[in-house]
Amino acid sequence: MNDTKRLRRPSAGGYVRGDETRLRIIEAAIESFGEHGFEGASTRDIAARAGVNAPALQYYFENKEGVYRACAEYIADASWETFEPVVTHAAEVLSNDSDTPVLIDAFIRIQEAIADRMFLKACGPTNQRLFFAREQAGHEPSIASEILTRRLRQPLNDVGSRLIARITGTKPDDPLALIRMLSLHGQLLMFHVAPRTTLALLGWTEIDAEKGELLKATVRAQTRILLEQWSNEASNEVLANARESSGSKKPVARAVAKKTAARKSTTASAKK
């Protein structure tokens, strides 16, 4: 999408009137795409939800594919505002060769940002959740996945896997490190993709700020326990390998010492 199609902020602050209309269309489109999918959503329905005439969509986005792309870009922009600080912090602690407790805290900060984005940001989370669900099902245009992967998932997964690798003594591309990262993030996933089931089980009607903090505290504690355990296991394995390596050298050293002593004894006898 060319720059003329992007939101433009005036120097005085806020959005120009045309950009307000564009934003309304995007929010309406996220809702429509989430409910009906790309094929089921119509430009007429999107225009009606946004309170504009159908030709306005063509003016701002050219076609329905352009609207869909703009929705993915909008979600990526809004999400990155939440994730950029924790991703930057994680990259810094990794480059500073920080100790394990600092690395664990950095990973937990990423999880908390994910939870905030899922539950606590007042920017149409329900509609965006449906949009995400359809995109993940693989039946929607691939452009959304490409945008969200490049701008959100890849940066998050990169620092997340590097943190896990450093904490647990593996490599970032090791399947074990990736499985551990995904399983830790998966603690939040059930509440995001199956809210009806989880809320009914808990007797909740929604996840407000207080309940969101309870979720974060629970996940934070569980994540810390697991990361500390995996770190300790890795340290113990290193020590065990070091002892084994050291132990294997002792018999060789003793054998060499015996041979040296024998040679000295033989030499002494010959001199006599």
Residue ranges and their predicted role:
Residues 18, 22-30:
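Short, leucine-enriched amphipathic alpha-helices that occur as contiguous helical runs
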Residues 1-9, 109, 113-124, 150-179, ...:
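C-terminal peripheral helix-coil segments that are non-catalytic and often amphipathic
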Residues 78, 82, 86, 135, ...:
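A short secondary-structure junction motif
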Residues 9-15, 21:
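Short Lys/Arg-rich basic patches
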Residues 24, 32-74:
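Helix-turn-helix
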Residues 121-153:
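Hydrophobic, aromatic-enriched interface-forming segments
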Residues 71-106:
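Amphipathic alpha-helical linker/stalk segments
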